[in-house]
A protein has these predicted regions:
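Beta-propeller folds
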Residues: 6, 15-217
């Protein structure tokens, strides 16, 4: 008897529950933060960054730690990290004299020396000054096997969105009418000297909600 009564009561409870409409705003009061480029989201970001920066700078060890980190970063005796391409070792170097950095290369024999000589390919501080831009290095992709043509990416102030241009190492200049992608969260990769894969904003539906390329052409 009791088992039947409890079963009937449970069944009545199931049918008596009324479905409630789903309100996404009530479920997540911060849903507007998903608009990564929205004015409200960016304003909130700047506000929270200011609060966090003030808290960090108020710490007793902040100034001392900052000075020590800068000393390490600007130490010219640190071993440069390199990428080998053909006969050359490539490195991107930043220090107090070159805050935006130098993209440079050298030979293995020279690299083994205590004070190697470097061939500077791009001075990012000079480039930014010449173009009146706050360029931050985004990387290089050079075409094998001779590695003479490279796709150089830079961003404004270190943003995720980058500008990509084709660079001629032999001439030490960007290629006139060469491969170029305007500022976007994009990707450009070599196929051959005349062809590249492109992932960028091709119009409606070509980008993810976070602003990255959904389509490669």
């Amino acid at each position: 008897f009791w088992r039947c009564a409890l079963s009937a009561l449970a069944l009545m409870c199931v049918f008596s529950v009324k479905a409630q409409p789903v309100n996404s705003a009530n479920m997540d009061p911060y849903l507007w933060l998903e608009e990564v480029q929205g004015d409200k989201a960016l304003a909130w970001l700047r506000e929270r960054n200011a609060v966090s920066t003030a808290l960090l700078q108020a710490q007793p060890l902040f100034a001392d730690n900052r000075a020590k980190v800068l000393e390490v970063l600007n130490n010219r005796d640190q071993i440069p990290r390199v990428t080998r391409r053909g006969d050359y070792l490539y490195n991107f170097w930043r220090d107090a004299k070159n805050p935006r950095g130098l993209w440079r290369r050298t030979h293995l024999e020279e690299y083994r020396k205590v004070q190697p000589k470097w061939d500077v390919l791009i001075d990012l501080d000079a480039l930014g000054k010449a173009e009146n831009e706050n360029w931050v290095w985004g990387g290089s992709d050079c075409l094998a096997p001779d590695y003479n043509r490279c796709l150089i990416s830079v961003s404004r102030g270190g943003a995720d969105a980058k500008v990509t241009r084709e660079f001629d190492i032999a001439k030490r200049e960007f290629v006139k009418d060469g491969f170029y992608l305007p500022e976007a969260k994009s990707q450009l990769d070599w196929v051959d000297i005349n062809t590249v894969y492109v992932g960028t904003d091709f119009g409606p539906g070509s980008m993810t909600r976070s602003g990255y390329a959904r389509i490669i052409k």
